[in-house]
Amino acid sequence: LGSTLIALIHNGECFQWDADAANATSTRATIITGAPTASRDMLVSTPDRHLVFFGTETTIGNKATQDDMFIRFSSQENINDYTPTAENSAGTQRLAAGSRIMGATLGRNAIYIWSDTSLFTMRFVGTPFTFAFEQVGTNCGLIGMNAAVEVDGAAYWMSDNGFFRYTGKLESMDCLVEDYVYDDLNTTSNQLIYCGINNLFGEITWFYPTSTSNVNTRSVTYSYLDSTAKRPIWFTNASTLFPRTTWEDSAVFGLPHATKYNASDDTSFDVTGNTEGTTIYFEHETGVNQQEAGTTAVAIPANITSGDYDITQKVVRGAATNMADLRGDGENIM
């Protein structure tokens, strides 16, 4: 929010850190005065500049009143004022469809809010209501709080029952590797699933834990630039060199940046955190190898896995290959 960094502990307090304050680098973040003390998610609505809490308290400061479907937003440009009055723009809203809010993402024209069953939009409309809420999808809930992104006015997300897109209408996305993903997915660790955009190549990737892992070990990618309605392009990556826990697109740093969790204990320095292990920070699309500190540069292997197909079967022109009808005699070399 401007030069103020805001961070939320899931189901906990919200903190602020002012980068412009004197001795800022030696000053700890502080709990935001007047803000809810227990919330599932949080973001800043732009350009109207309201701080919004999702799955939060009906009575501010009383954690026992946390309602997983309740939304509370501050007055405009005042992150300390959350009590609605005739003089401010603070307010509240409770969503009806679902049992808990799973996550929210800022979009081009609205904030997208997902419960465990449904999709809602939250649009700034000004006085007297400040925001308008609309349910725009059912049976399409979000699988984890970081499993959705918005790109070019469209929202993409991973649900418990497939992949979805919203472009003004709800669409279930055809995914050629859906069984491969969902048949080996740790749904208990669903909050680890992380979705990131690589706009340099027009790709959306979901990093997820397999059924035998408690950390992200595999990914599935959708090419939103090259896909068509009849020819969606998906690919997976199970390389041990490419698990990622978070991802930030090149729009922020010029190149994609990501992190990886290494569960092995590094005895060269003290580790402070919830579990033993280290997090490694990567800048992507730099060079051709993966380089970790203290290790040898390694190229991430490329491979293609295909399945059986019958070249004698007629296909609609362009539907399967984006090429002409390929029936006829000849050699098929793999």
What are these regions (language model features)?
Residues 5-6, 52, 205:
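Conserved beta-strand elements of the Class I
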Residues 15, 61, 266:
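Glycine/Thr-rich phosphate-binding loops of Rossmann-like dinucleotide-binding domains
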Residues 1, 99, 137-154, 160-334:
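Beta-sheet repeat architectures centered on beta-propellers
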Residues 22-194, 229-240:
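Beta-propeller and closely related beta-pinwheel folds
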Residues 2-30:
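Hydrophobic or amphipathic alpha-helical targeting/insertion segments
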Residues 8-11, 55-56, 208-210, 260-261:
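Structural motif
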